[in-house]
Amino acid sequence: PWRAIRAGKQLSDSKGASAALSTEVAIMAVHRAMAGFIGPKDIFRNPEAIFRQLEPTKDHSHSPFDIVLSKSGDDFAVMQMHFKLGLYEHQSASAIDGLINMISEHTDAILDGGNADNISKIKITSYEPAYGIIGDPAKRNPTTRQSADHSMVYIISSILRKALEKHENIKAEHTIEDLWKYLMLLPVDYGKNALFN
């Protein structure tokens, strides 16, 4: 139940906005606390806290997990974050890299003057988390931007379609980095016209 906005057949705006909304609530909570607003006491050891429901403790004096509070320093969680390579779920990066490497190594054979008839199927071998998150059959026909950027089928086929459409500008001497930049999926690649192309 905790993944409801991040999983399912079609993802919505809630998925795309979840980080922003939680940040907004956190900032609002800090402002209220600075103005003297007091929240419930001891939410981690409270027997009614959601944390206690999921991870029961032996008695009421223990928290189900350790929490370390700091007031200064540079060991913040944000420093452990990484950025996605583009507008797609990061589990697709290895498949995208494989496709781009294949286009780089076999430019003429794959792009064949923009003719897709030489491509009869695409087989992607991936690891379980990638399949479970973006490869399952529920993600085959996305109808929203949020579902499309979580669909391995959509991401790979869109990059390949983009390469075929722009075949005249793709040269064998392009570097892998050039191809990544050139074939990067943009917001327009997730618009209604692209979704139903």
Regions found by a protein language model. Name each.
Residues P1-I5:
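Conserved catalytic cysteine-centered active-site region
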Residues A7-E24, H31-N197:
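Terminal-appendage/accessory-domain detector
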